[in-house]
């Protein structure tokens, strides 16, 4: 356990642990490969999910920990969908590979509504934890609604990415901006830098996938 908690360096007076650096590196590699339309992103994603599970377990962040099996399931679904498209979904450039597609506007409206409702309901429950419910057992979340909105957006972005929807990168951009806000408010230094790298990759991938979409339109 102590091996993973080795302090590699300090940034802005905050220690950066080995587990933090590894998680950031594998996370960035996963989205980088996904943005380049590489199926290898799923294999790296499995390692990333395992690292997050271990990190959240160590830090007693059980709300985040229980999401990792869900992320694992989405990753498995994505690997299958990208490799086993229906004939009408097959890429014109690569046989046997899922093409990039887009959500319709009605579908976007439904997803946005679901994200807002789920984030509000989950945020309300989290706002009660440590303040009115289980006081002394759970630390109060200073930004419950923003935190829950980010979590719901992450699961939404992962699902859309697994289905190879261009819109996933829009969701990821919202996630990156929200995460950047959360990390800065928490006084962190290393994670905002990582979030900026995610943001740059998200913008690049948005245009990369749009070009792929146009080729198959």
Q: Predicted segments — roles?
A:
Residues 1-37, 73, 82-89, 97-217:
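Polytopic alpha-helical membrane-helix bundles and their juxtamembrane interface segments
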Residues 33-47:
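Membrane-interface helix-loop junction between the first two transmembrane segments
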């Amino acid at each position: 356990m102590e091996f993973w908690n080795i302090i590699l360096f300090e940034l802005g007076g905050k220690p950066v642990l080995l587990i933090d650096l590894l998680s950031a590196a594998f996370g960035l590699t996963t989205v980088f490969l996904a943005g380049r339309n590489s199926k290898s992103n799923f294999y790296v994603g499995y390692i990333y999910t395992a690292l997050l599970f271990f990190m959240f377990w160590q830090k007693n962040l059980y709300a985040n920990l229980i999401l990792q099996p869900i992320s694992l399931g989405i990753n498995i679904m994505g690997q299958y969908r990208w490799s086993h498209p229906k004939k009408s979904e097959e890429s014109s450039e690569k046989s046997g590979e899922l093409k990039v597609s887009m959500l319709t506007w009605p579908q976007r409206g439904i997803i946005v509504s679901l994200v807002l409702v789920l984030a509000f309901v989950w945020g309300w429950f989290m706002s009660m934890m440590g303040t009115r419910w289980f006081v002394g057992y759970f630390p109060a979340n200073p930004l419950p609604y923003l935190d829950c909105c980010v979590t719901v957006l992450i699961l939404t972005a992962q699902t859309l990415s697994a289905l190879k929807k261009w819109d996933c990168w829009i969701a990821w951009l919202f996630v990156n901006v929200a995460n950047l806000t959360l990390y800065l408010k928490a006084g962190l230094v290393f994670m905002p830098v990582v979030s900026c790298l995610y943001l740059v990759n998200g913008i690049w991938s948005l245009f990369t996938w749009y070009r792929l979409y146009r080729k198959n339109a």
